[in-house]
Amino acid sequence: KLADCQIGKQEGTELFIVEGDSAGGSAKQGRNRANQAVLPLRGKILNTYVEEIVPKKNSNQNGSEHRTKALSKMISSNEIVTLINALGLDPKVEELDLKDLRYGKIIIMTDADVDGSHIRALLLTFFNNKPFNKLIENGHVYLAQPPLFKINKGTKGIYIKDEKALEEYIINNNKEVKKLKKGSKEYLKALDEEKSIMSIQRFKGLGEMNPEELWSTTLDPETRNLLQVQYSKDLKKDQKLIHTLMGNDVALRKDFIVSNAINVQNLDI
């Protein structure tokens, strides 16, 4: 259920989209109720990717028919319908009137692990579909950056975004590890040994963080990091990548994965 904010205008307000009631509970307690709303998504989010078509001459296909099918695919997900309603928008229109948008910032706040990344990708896929891509084009969609780790040092906690950031933290705070060649057996062994003697907590989800932690790391505008979702200058290239990853062509996606597997540094299985 949507926990709305007190301010009833678009300017200065934020909607946080979170996974489930556990994360939703912490977010609702930790937020600034004046301008921050929270929408927990409970059910499964579907892949709502819709391929844009350009009707060919002498073809039975037309834009209106394609739009109807696209809409049916999007609203087949109860969670997407809930989201559209929370935003104050109408899914049945060809063009969005952004004056109807209830919040200035739409912030996707999923868990920092691979499951959270998957849900984030599905939500971004929805926002890429017309007419909702207008929200991205006009700078309304953001990604929260919650921590995956907490390092306990005495009474203080140091929050770390992900595996890469944890590795960098260890390197910068250990001269012996820093001397070793990155990626070598000696380096990886020293890294694991250092991790084993540190007090590291891995958050399985945002629900494991208490409201104060969630506020200070992810919700507070003074201390948080937000990523604004933007298209690149080469929009066709963006859409080609989205089609490859989220479309129905399995062979195309497999080729992409095989071709880029060599570039993977941190694999979370």
PLM regions and their residue ranges:
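Conserved phosphate-chemistry cores used by DNA topoisomerases
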Residues: K1-I269
